[in-house]
């Protein structure tokens, strides 16, 4: 499998940002497809997650439970700023939120946010809260490494797949996450940790993608996120894919989503080399 370790980014490049419960390896098919179109790619891990899926499933670093949104975004900002030309940013779920936060800081040449966790000002739906319950319930969850039970993965991520496909996806990809991360997301309206300047006219182009059947980040949340940018003159586009769940980047037909992203990038920035 590919390493998620940061490597030198040279232009043009794409930085793939994973979300909660996933590792950089979840982006492998997308990286291969983008590289086939001429892009260089890298998928840096969140702090404490630069290990194999097997290692993370069996022995996660306990410090990971106290990792917050600010630390993760700062880590990506440092990685990107040490490189040369600003890269393209692609993120899923929390990764999609991080893409927006980074672009708002002036980091990145363009961004693609897929089923993004909501920035401040976008209220989570009932299903999003339900999807978070296994993480936030339990004494001390604020500072602990937390798991997503298989039944919650079935319900919130892969409900259109067969049970054998669901089990295989869970066993091969799902890792623990930070409890603090989810508390910050659910309390986002009370703090500025996920605040985005929706009127930032200098922001790089942004494509926001939703999955019609997503239960974890419902379509209405993604559309509300997109509409928040209505008063900005910066390019902001929206696309909803029918039949897609929160597993949109890996479920059958993911190639259509990736190709739409590639075509959008070609339109915004010019063709890849």
Where are these regions (language model features)?
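Conserved alpha/beta-hydrolase "acid-adjacent" motif
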Residues: 215-224
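Gly/Ala-rich beta-loop-alpha elbow adjacent to hydrolase catalytic centers
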Residues: 90-95, 99
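Active-site glycine-rich loops that stabilize anionic/oxyanionic intermediates
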Residues: 19-22, 93, 212
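Flexible "cap/lid" loop of the alpha/beta hydrolase fold
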Residues: 107-141, 181-189
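Short beta-strand/loop motif that positions the catalytic acidic residue
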Residues: 202, 208-210, 214
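Catalytic active-site module of serine/aspartate enzymes centered on a nucleophile-bearing elbow/loop
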Residues: 235-273
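Short, surface-exposed "cap/lid" segments of acyl-processing enzymes
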Residues: 7-55
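Conserved acidic catalytic loop of the alpha/beta-hydrolase fold
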Residues: 70-87
